[in-house]
């Protein structure tokens, strides 16, 4: 089973502001390199069109609900 807080971080990565994503990551006490890498990933994802981000989220939901994950 996937940690619900981890799922919240992933949701924040795709849907929230950079500061909200940083706060969500903070629960896991990342070191500076991890925080910087997360911020870079957020910047890259924010450049994707909304349709692409929505499709990625739908794919992750489909994977999570598939028989291969249950």
From Swiss-Prot:
In which tissues has expression of this protein been reported?
Club cells (nonciliated cells of the surface epithelium of the pulmonary airways).
Which family does the record assign? Belongs to the secretoglobin family.
MF annotations from Gene Ontology: phospholipase A2 inhibitor activity
Oligomeric form and interacting partners: Antiparallel homodimer; disulfide-linked. Interaction with LMBR1L is controversial.
Q: A single Pfam family, by name?
A: Uteroglobin
Quote the Gene3D superfamilies the UniProt record gives.
Secretoglobin
Location(s), subcellular: Secreted
What InterPro entries does UniProt report for this protein, alphabetically? Secretoglobin (IPR016126), Secretoglobin_1C-like (IPR043215), Secretoglobin_sf (IPR035960), Uteroglobin (IPR000329)
Q: Which cellular component terms (GO) are annotated to the entry?
A: cytoplasm; extracellular space
Purpose of the protein: Binds phosphatidylcholine, phosphatidylinositol, polychlorinated biphenyls (PCB) and weakly progesterone, potent inhibitor of phospholipase A2.
Which species expresses this protein natively? Macaca fuscata fuscata (Japanese macaque)
This protein's name: Uteroglobin
Query: Known PROSITE patterns for this protein?
Result: SCGB
Keywords linked to the UniProt accession: Disulfide bond, Phospholipase A2 inhibitor, Secreted
The processes (GO biological process) annotated in the record are: signal transduction
CDD domains, from UniProt? Secretoglobin
Q: Which gene encodes it?
A: SCGB1A1
């Amino acid at each position: 089973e996937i940690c619900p807080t981890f799922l919240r971080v992933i949701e924040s990565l795709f849907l929230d502001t950079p500061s909200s994503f940083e706060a969500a990551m903070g629960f896991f006490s990342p070191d500076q390199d991890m925080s910087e890498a997360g911020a870079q990933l957020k910047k890259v994802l924010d450049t994707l069109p909304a349709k692409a981000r929505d499709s990625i989220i739908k794919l992750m939901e489909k994977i999570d609900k598939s028989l291969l994950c249950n």
